[in-house]
């Protein structure tokens, strides 16, 4: 069995990966747009076309990777949400859902639930223990 925090944090890490790939795609889009505008003002040379094609293909490749990651995070969120639903205590479900699905900080959770931050940390630890007990089939 995986460490429950590591397992649950997959959503956070996948989300960060997607965000970094989106930034990469935006930079590639900008490079393609700059190249496109230079095509409109200059005569197109064969090597320029090849360079443009390479950039455009990289842009398409990154876009496809992002789509795959979005599908992955969607499935992961559903699976984790269903596992969290197995917990008996509503506070545990709320804390784990806010922390690992909604990607909230402990401080944001404390404010939202009107609890002291120490209480949130204690409840989070209890929620993780219940998660391990109820969701022993983590993959």
Short names for language-model regions:
Residues 1-86, 133-139:
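N-terminal interaction/assembly modules
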Residues 76-79, 90-92, 123:
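N-terminal positioning helix adjacent to the helix-turn-helix/winged-helix DNA-binding module
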Residues 88-102:
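Short amphipathic alpha helix immediately N-terminal
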Residues 106, 128:
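Generic structural marker for isolated residues within well-ordered, non-membrane alpha-helices
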Residues 108-113:
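Short alpha-helical "recognition helix" segments of helix-turn-helix
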Residues 118:
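Key DNA-contact positions within bacterial/archaeal DNA-binding proteins
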Residues 124, 131:
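DNA major-groove recognition helix of helix-turn-helix
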């Amino acid at each position: 069995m995986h460490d429950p925090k590591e397992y649950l944090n997959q959503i956070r890490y996948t989300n960060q990966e997607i965000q970094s790939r989106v930034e990469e795609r935006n930079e590639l889009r900008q490079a393609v747009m700059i190249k496109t505008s230079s095509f409109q003002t200059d005569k197109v040379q064969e090597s320029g076309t090849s360079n443009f094609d390479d950039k455009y293909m990289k842009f398409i490749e990154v876009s496809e990777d992002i789509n795959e990651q979005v599908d992955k995070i969607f499935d992961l969120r559903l699976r984790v949400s269903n596992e969290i639903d197995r917990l008996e205590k509503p506070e545990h479900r709320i804390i784990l859902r806010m922390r690992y699905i909604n990607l909230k900080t402990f401080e944001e959770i404390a404010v939202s639930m009107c609890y002291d931050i120490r209480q949130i940390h204690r409840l989070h630890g209890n929620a993780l223990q219940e998660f391990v007990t109820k969701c022993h089939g983590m993959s």
